[in-house]
Amino acid sequence: WVEGDWDGLHYRLELVLADQATAWFWHVELFNASLHHERVDLLLLQDLALAPWGAVRLNEAYVSHYIDHHPLAHPAHGTLIASRQNQPVDGRAPWLLSGCLGFGVGWATDARQLWPAHAAGTAEASALGADLPSARWQHEHSLVALQGERFVLASGARTQRGFFGWLQADHPAASGPDDLSVVDQVMALPEARWTPPPSVADDGGEAGNLFASAPRFAAREARADAHELHAWYPGPWRH
């Protein structure tokens, strides 16, 4: 996980891998440390290949062009994007479902929708200051982009949001409404629930260890005399 501060907001981002499925979760915690309310939305951007490493390195544009992106509308989680590699991989069609843990309201499927040709090579996507276009492009810059529902975070308030990904090695049929049932499997995973981070000492000291957390030995002020020392260490003395 990583954490930091930006414009009065403290954020903590954690990537959690599911133990019982090929799935992952981006958990985001936000705290408004400013003195005024903030309007916030979260974006997920993921460059996709859904192909073997060798094929991707040989021709990224060719592999990207064969990914079919299909937006799906879920009653509780808004817009999802199902991405299927239509160029067979060892006779299989790898498939990824991406969605919001909250409610998705915007989406895009190609990097050119966020980085137009005239902005190629720039660090920041020119479209990040506006809503995602919610239109399907299937060119040679395959990208999943999801925008969560905008909300107001009051001063001193804290919230948790996030996104999920579910990967299948083979999805023989084209993406469609029947795939919405996968969301129930995703949300049933224990990793879908945000868990508080481990506590850290307020003084910024080192993480807890045996010497810092074990009960202290009882001590006394007076020095032990020879009789007590022989009682504690009855064997032969070397010094």
Can you annotate each of these PLM segments?
Residues 2, 16-126, 173, 177-238:
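Polysaccharide-binding surfaces and accessory modules of carbohydrate-active proteins
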Residues 10, 23-25, 158-162:
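Intrinsic-disorder/low-complexity, polar/charged segments enriched in Ser/Thr/Lys/Arg/Asp/Glu/Gln
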Residues 1-23, 121-147:
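Extended, loop-rich substrate-binding clefts of extracytoplasmic carbohydrate-active enzymes
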Residues 9-12, 87-92, 153-155:
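Short, surface-exposed beta-strand/loop "edge" segments at domain boundaries and coil↔beta transitions
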Residues 7-9, 36, 157:
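Short acidic/polar mixed-charge low-complexity motifs
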Residues 38, 151-169:
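Short Pro-Gly-centered flexible turn/kink motifs
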